[in-house]
């Protein structure tokens, strides 16, 4: 049973890490950018994330 708990803990850590990475991969509105993909739900216009 201990192995099962270890595996669940390991998966939880991986999920948390992936979510944290995804959250940091995009910039909020008004942030500096180069490509549209850098902005969360916005476009990159004049080097700034805009709606």
Curated annotation (Swiss-Prot):
Expressed by the venom gland. The most highly expressed peptides U-Asilidin1-Mar1a is around 3000 times higher expressed in the venom thoracic glands compared to its body tissues. One of its GO terms (molecular function) is toxin activity. Its main location: secreted. Keywords: Disulfide bond, Knottin, Neurotoxin, Secreted, Signal, Toxin. GO terms for cellular component: extracellular region. It is found in: Secreted. Disulfide bonds join 26-40, 33-44, 39-49. Residues 1-23 form the signal peptide. The keyword Signal applies. Belongs to the asilidin-1 family. The presence of a 'disulfide through disulfide knot' structurally defines this protein as a knottin. Induces neurotoxic effect on honeybees, including slow movements, disorientation and paralysis. Since it provokes similar symptoms than omega-atracotoxin, it is probable that it acts in the same way by inhibiting voltage-gated calcium channels. This is U-Asilidin(1)-Eru1a. It comes from Eutolmus rufibarbis (Golden-tabbed robberfly).
């Amino acid at each position: 049973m201990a192995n099962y708990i270890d595996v669940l803990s390991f998966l939880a850590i991986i999920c948390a890490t992936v979510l944290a990475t995804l959250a940091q991969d995009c910039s909020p509105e008004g942030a500096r950018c180069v490509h549209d993909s850098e902005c969360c739900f916005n476009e990159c216009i004049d080097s700034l994330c805009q709606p």
